[in-house]
A protein has these predicted regions:
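Active-site anion-handling motifs in enzyme catalytic cores
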Residues: 1-385
């Protein structure tokens, strides 16, 4: 029987699509190109995460018309973001290669054909604040057939503490997994508190591929970015203070900043030093970082790709908010000899120059973890009942 991958990918978020691509590619490399299905499923009832609110055929026409007017008033070049969306849809079909059947709701997964194993993860599949558009976190896999074997690779909770209100639900669901691996130490602690077992911490799927493998997959043969630049990627909504700080960073580095974001860019005053790159699809995002002189990011996956391509980086997070994604950035930097490298984004906005370097990266430890993580993934597959 085949193996199935159940993960986040029907969206325009770069990290989500790229981790799904990397894990599917790795699984297919281990088991065979035709031995792995990526379960094609909606993340919300109208498929808005992938299809958006302007051209989405699942949204009534009058709402699309109203949304188009709102977007035109609020966002910078929404037409380019819609172009990015179209390119992302095409890339997912070609590179992730999900199943022909689209499961419109978690309830439909009860009719899922039997698989030898369903692999859940990676990314923030178990974030209690996300993935609840259907009234529950679908990646807890409670809608899978009861007898279906399930494991988790590099699952992330995205928070350092689980709210008390959902601990019972999570504990019951996670105990049904035969084996779990997580992406962060904080996730390991949460799992241990819920199940009594501390799972191994493994690398994000994007780091299972080497820089050479990423070059072969998405960089080689494609046109490079136009000249030296800083690749900036913001997962939170970009503010004018962010743009102004990036302009100062550009002047400090002596090269322009090419700015990408997880969602549409608001209408802001973009100085000449900051060039919006709104229509970059996930593979263009990788190329931007691979070809950059340095990286500035508040994103976990922005940091991952800076490390993969050994680019000097400024990692920025809200260090005063325990609910922010900063814990993931801090955890990664601490594990690989970059402790203290995550700068508070408020300080960055206030003009404090970031520490930009990659020389301290413990490459030996990172490579050892890559080999170990691949071994853990093989163990998930080989020890099935």
């Amino acid at each position: 029987m085949k193996t199935a991958l159940y993960t986040i990918f029907r969206c325009t978020n770069y990290g989500a699509v790229l981790q799904a691509f990397a894990l599917a590619r790795t699984l297919r490399g281990m088991l065979g190109e035709d031995a792995v299905d990526v379960i094609n499923h909606r993340m919300d009832p109208r498929d808005t995460h992938l299809l958006g609110k302007i051209t989405n055929p699942n949204t009534p026409w009058f709402q699309r018309w109203r949304n188009r007017r709102k977007f035109a008033a609020r966002y910078f070049r929404p037409d380019l973001f819609e172009a990015r969306r179209a390119k992302t849809v095409e890339l997912i079909a070609k590179e992730v290669r999900p199943t022909a059947r689209l499961y419109a709701s978690p309830q439909e997964l009860k009719s899922l054909q039997p698989y030898s194993t369903v692999v859940v993860g990676s990314d923030q599949v178990w974030n209690p604040l996300l993935n609840t558009d259907f009234g529950c976190n679908q990646y807890l896999a409670t809608s899978l057939p009861d007898r279906q074997d399930r494991v988790a690779y590099a699952a992330s909770f995205g928070v350092s503490e689980l709210p008390e209100t959902c601990r019972g639900e999570y504990a019951a669901a996670l105990r049904r997994f035969r084996r779990i691996t997580v992406r962060e130490e904080t996730g390991a602690a949460i799992c241990e508190s819920l199940t009594g077992r501390r799972p191994p911490v493994v690398l994000d799927p994007t780091m299972l591929l080497t820089a050479e493998e990423w070059h072969d997959a998405v960089v080689r043969g494609a046109s490079a970015a136009k000249g030296p630049h800083v690749a900036a990627y913001w997962v939170r909504t970009v503010s004018q203070a962010d743009v102004d700080a990036l302009a100062a960073f550009s002047r400090m580095r002596g090269v322009p900043v090419r700015l990408m974001s997880a969602g549409p860019l608001p209408k802001l005053d973009f100085p000449k030093e900051v060039v919006p790159f709104v229509d970059a699809d996930p593979f263009a995002f990788v190329r931007e970082i691979a070809d950059s002189d340095a990286v500035a990011t508040d994103s976990f996956h922005g940091l991952q790709f800076a490390a993969i391509f050994r680019r000097p980086f400024a990692a920025l997070g809200d260090l005063h908010d325990p609910g922010s994604n900063a814990s993931r950035l801090v955890d990664f930097c601490r594990r690989y000899g970059l402790g203290g490298r995550v700068q508070d984004i408020g300080s960055f906005r206030n003009g404090e120059a970031p520490h930009v370097d990659v020389g301290e990266l413990d490459e030996q430890a990172l490579e050892a973890d890559r080999v170990r993580s691949l071994g853990e993934l093989r163990a998930l597959l080989s020890s099935r009942p």
